[in-house]
Design a protein with these regions (language model features):
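A conserved regulatory-domain signal marking ACT and ACT-like small-molecule sensing domains
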Residues: 206-230
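Nucleotide/pyrophosphate-binding catalytic subdomain
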Residues: 1-178, 183
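Terminal amphipathic helices with adjacent charged low-complexity linkers/tails
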Residues: 146, 195-213
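Short amphipathic alpha-helical patches
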Residues: 34, 151, 190, 209-210
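Acidic/polar loop patches that form or flank catalytic/metal-binding clefts of enzymes
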Residues: 179, 190-197
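Acidic-aromatic/histidine active-site loop/patch
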Residues: 186
Length: 230
């Protein structure tokens, strides 16, 4: 309870600083009640994202949509793309702007289920597919994909354009800019991805598309591997 009070106070400071007409007392009461009822680790992990979404929606004047109401997993925790896409498309059909927090949804029993680390990328791609977006902008903390590992080569160039297939190969080699689970929903619909840097919005980033005719773009070197020619 003391920890929740500290968190609540911090949110109140943020709300006051933004001069918002938002009261989260009821939300914190629900969170405490669910914690006492042993709601689980995924529920706890998702509450910051949920509360941030409420604040952001109020600040922007957009509708807030709880992912637990529109993103679904089965009883084994496996994501259900068809059910989710149908529900999301119907929910967003008449919504011009909305804030949808990332990385979690719910199982059939109502319990919260999270995606793996980086799951907000997946949430964004799911929403982009549901609304048939022209492009999916993924804002992160880097300026796109690099031509090689910066731990090996100093100041490598950023790849301006890359294909879905090339991206998948890079992910197998350890590239972690984008959650690999975010690729499939967008590739199905032919929606390009633009990876951009939140901390450097002027940077052009990397565009991910279905096809490109440009030359090879990157060099990878998996550690602890040896090749023999016989």
């Amino acid at each position: 309870k003391k920890i929740l009070e500290k968190i609540k106070k911090r949110y109140e400071e943020i709300i006051d600083g933004l001069d918002l007409n938002l009261n989260l007392d009821h939300e914190f009461d629900k969170i405490e009640e669910n914690f006492l009822a042993k709601a689980g680790r995924d529920y706890a992990a998702s509450r910051g994202e949920y509360l941030n979404g409420l604040v952001m929606a109020e600040y922007l004047g957009y509708e807030f949509i709880d992912p637990a109401e529109v993103i679904f997993f089965d009883e084994h925790g496996v994501f259900e793309p068809e059910t989710t896409n149908k529900e999301l498309a119907e929910r967003l059909e008449h919504v011009e702007r909305a804030v949808i927090p990332g990385f979690y949804g719910s199982k059939h029993d109502g319990s919260v289920k999270t995606f793996s680390r980086g799951g907000s990328d997946v949430t964004g791609s799911i929403v982009a597919k549901a609304v048939h977006a022209d492009i999916y902008e993924n804002w992160t903390d880097v300026s796109g994909f690099l031509v090689t590992d910066p731990r090996i080569v100093k100041d490598p160039e950023v790849i301006s354009t890359i294909t879905y297939r090339e991206l998948r190969e890079l992910s197998y080699m350890g590239a972690t800019v984008l959650h690999e689970g975010s690729i499939f929903p967008l590739r199905q619909e032919g929606i390009p991805i633009h990876v951009l840097n939140t901390n450097a919005p002027q940077d052009p980033g990397t565009m991910i598309v279905e096809n490109t005719c440009s030359k090879p773009k990157s060099t990878t070197f998996p550690p602890a591997q040896t090749a023999f020619k016989i």
